[in-house]
From Swiss-Prot:
Cellular compartment(s): Mitochondrion
Keyword field contains Mitochondrion: yes
Annotated Gene Ontology cellular component terms: mitochondrion
Identification of the protein by name: Genetic interactor of prohibitin 5, mitochondrial
Family under the similarity heading: Belongs to the GEP5 family.
Keywords per UniProt: Mitochondrion
Role description: Essential for respiratory growth and required for maintenance of mtDNA. Required for cell survival in the absence of prohibitins.
Domain of life: Eukaryota
Length: 278
């Protein structure tokens, strides 16, 4: 079955870079059932009808899901390894705070929790006390990780809706987790709220690392160069060109910059479409 899927994919008129990525990641992809299944579905749809929409879904899967399999960015590896630190420092707000802000005419502009210190966060939620470590190094890593997620990581506008076309990516702070009120007006239990925070941390991880991960800068540059060379040739089909152009419009890349005064790397995101005009 997998051999047939690969044979059909090789017959599709895609850019050579796309074929190279699949060949490089094939052995690892077939061992991950969900990733391989999505790839096989996209290939089947393109084989039935070579439309721009089907091609866009296929090339998005190839370049955003398969390509980063062997080159997950350092900040996402840190996100994965420091799960408990993220849970402990995730910004939260109660539904009562939102309602009070709306009564004062501030609408949804309640972003104070993003500026809270770790001490205030621990004091607010009893279930975080058990995760608090006295090691200064670990606390420092928590602060750095929290700052990275809030100020650098592109996130959703409040929730992850499962849309994988990249349009939900923004460059704002990480979404607040809302502690809801019960029908009687009391705050929901700590256990239920703890699970809600964990769910938000996991959902954001899936969005940033699984559904729509960033392209590495070398990969983005190579994709732009390859597309520019191919667009001027007569053998390039219009639907294929449109699919890759739409991919570039929705894609984003990242760079790490270092300064003399800062030991930690500063993470910066940019749209790949900005590279096309250069």
């Amino acid at each position: 079955m997998s051999g047939r899927v690969l044979e059909v994919f090789r017959g599709l008129p895609l850019l050579p870079l796309s074929h190279e990525i699949v060949a490089r990641c094939w052995d690892r992809m077939v061992r991950q059932r969900d990733v391989y299944y999505q790839f096989a579905v996209h290939v089947s749809h393109c084989h039935e009808r070579l439309s721009t929409r089907n091609l866009l879904r296929l090339v998005t899967h190839v370049h955003h899901v398969l390509a980063p399999m062997n080159e997950l960015p350092a900040h996402l590896r840190q996100y994965q390894s420091e799960y408990h630190a993220l849970v402990a420092s995730w910004p939260t707000v109660t539904e009562r705070q939102i309602l009070d802000a709306m009564e004062l005419g501030k609408g949804m502009a309640v972003r104070i929790p993003h500026n809270k210190t770790l001490r205030q966060m621990f004091e607010q939620h009893e279930w975080l006390v058990q995760q608090r470590l006295l090691d200064d190094k670990r606390l420092k890593r928590r602060r750095l990780l929290r700052c990275e997620v809030q100020m650098a990581t592109p996130t959703t506008n409040g929730s992850t809706n499962g849309n994988t076309n990249g349009s939900e990516i923004s460059f704002r702070q990480c979404p607040l987790t809302i502690r809801e009120l019960t029908p009687l007006g009391a705050l929901e239990s700590e256990a239920k709220f703890k699970n809600r925070v964990r769910s938000d941390v996991h959902s954001l991880w899936r969005l940033l690392a699984v559904q729509h991960p960033p392209l590495s800068r070398p990969h983005a540059d190579e994709l732009v160069r390859t597309l520019k060379r191919t667009l001027g040739t007569s053998r390039t089909d219009r639907s294929i060109a449109r699919a890759y152009l739409q991919l570039l419009q929705r894609a984003y890349t990242y760079t790490y910059t270092y300064t003399d005064t800062e030991a930690e790397a500063q993470l910066q995101y940019s749209r790949v479409s900005q590279l096309v005009s250069h």
